[in-house]
């Protein structure tokens, strides 16, 4: 379990310093060594003396109450965790806004037709969600389905956590290009959930100009979670797979993944991104895979990006961001970072926006 082994089996995470994985593995190694030494030097001698004096059956009978108590403690803990509020969407950092509600198809979605407020980065942010469950300028905003539209899909980076609506990437791109832009992103979504949300929403827009899908290597780990609706083999949409919550907690504390699990996630992610571009082309729209990265990138994130996108032959728009362009106490891009991303997307799409595409201001 050296540094290379950790890089291979512990994926980069947006909200988790990779150094934590190295420390966790180091602590685990020390703990295993200590346990082995204790077993050899202490427990073996005690067990030998106790067996000689009492007999194996007596020892088992004496230990039975403790073992039963341990089993019951695990069972009760599992029940407590299952009855507590538990959802993948509540990944750190936890925020009460924008408010989420259960969705039988996608797992969760924004609560439609409301506005909520939350302090983020020292600012009071208004999160307005329209009747279609899309973040917008106000709850009463209604996109014109007949207007030329740029559709953005993804998760909280696109939804604009910590940003006022005009500061979000979709709003900035729409303003710069003078066309309607709509966000169908939902906080906490993995790539496959974002794609399914896009498939639900895209047919409603009669004149899509472009489809922009976010992909971040630091969020790839979400694509391997199965305790939510997800794609199985062959891009078959499957319901959440029941799992022990205690096992999930342990995995999140030590997020080890096997080579096979990671490879399956790579193949699924490639297929979803290719399908996104194909769906855009089928509607006569320009497809863009948007990949903002904070620099310098972690080596593991670079390797993952190249493995999924470059080796997969998937074109993408890479937007480097300064590490300081993060919301205070949070990992999301701040207004400076969002502005740089918005400028890059607008520049990428400008050649594909026909003259007189403006219909009315974006939602």
Regions found by a protein language model. Name each.
Residues 1-45:
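Membrane-embedded alpha-helical segments of integral membrane proteins
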Residues 2-9, 214-309, 314, 318-330, ...:
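Serine-dependent acyl-ester chemistry module
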Residues 30-67:
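Cytosolic-side transmembrane helix boundary signature
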Residues 62-88:
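Transmembrane alpha-helices and immediately adjacent membrane-cytoplasm interface residues
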Residues 84-179, 322-326:
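Membrane/wall-proximal cationic-aromatic binding patches
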Residues 159-234:
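Conserved SGNH/GDSL esterase-like catalytic core that processes O-acyl groups on lipids
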Residues 191, 195, 266, 270, ...:
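Short, amphipathic alpha-helical "lid/cap" segments that border enzyme active or binding sites
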Residues 329-363:
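Histidine-centered active-site loop/cap adjacent to the catalytic His
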């Amino acid at each position: 379990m050296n540094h290379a082994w950790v890089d291979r089996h512990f994926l980069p995470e947006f909200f988790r310093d990779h150094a934590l994985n190295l420390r966790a593995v180091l602590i685990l190694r020390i703990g295993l060594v200590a346990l082995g030494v204790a077993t050899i030097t202490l427990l073996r001698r005690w067990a030998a003396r106790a067996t000689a004096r009492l007999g194996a059956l007596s020892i088992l009978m004496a230990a039975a109450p403790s073992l039963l108590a341990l089993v019951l403690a695990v069972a009760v803990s599992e029940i407590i965790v299952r009855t507590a509020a538990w959802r993948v969407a509540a990944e750190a950092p936890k925020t009460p806004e924008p408010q989420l509600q259960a969705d039988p198809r996608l797992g969760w979605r924004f609560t439609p037709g409301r506005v909520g407020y939350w302090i983020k980065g020292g600012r009071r942010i208004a999160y307005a969600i329209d009747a279609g469950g899309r973040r917008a300028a106000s709850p009463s905003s209604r996109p014109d389905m007949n207007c030329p539209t740029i559709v953005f899909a993804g998760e909280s980076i696109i939804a604009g956590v910590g940003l006022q609506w005009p500061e979000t990437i979709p709003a900035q791109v729409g303003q710069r290009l003078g066309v309607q832009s709509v966000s169908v992103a939902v906080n906490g979504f993995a790539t496959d959930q974002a794609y399914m949300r896009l498939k639900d929403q895209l047919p409603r827009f009669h004149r899509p100009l472009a489809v922009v899908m976010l992909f971040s290597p630091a969020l790839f780990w979400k694509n391997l979670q199965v305790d939510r609706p997800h794609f199985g083999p062959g891009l078959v949409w499957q319901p959440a797979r029941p799992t022990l919550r205690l096992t999930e907690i342990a995995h999140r504390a030590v997020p080890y993944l096997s080579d096979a699990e990671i490879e399956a996630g790579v193949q699924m992610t490639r297929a979803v991104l290719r399908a996104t571009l194909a769906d855009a082309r089928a509607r006569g729209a320009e497809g863009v895979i948007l990949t903002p990265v904070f620099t310098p990138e972690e080596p593991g994130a670079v390797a993952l990006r190249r493995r999924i996108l470059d080796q997969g032959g998937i074109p993408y728009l890479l937007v480097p961001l300064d590490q300081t362009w993060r919301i205070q106490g949070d990992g999301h891009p701040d207004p400076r970072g969002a502005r740089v991303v918005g400028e890059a997307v607008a520049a990428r799409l400008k050649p594909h926006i026909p003259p007189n595409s403006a219909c009315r201001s974006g939602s």
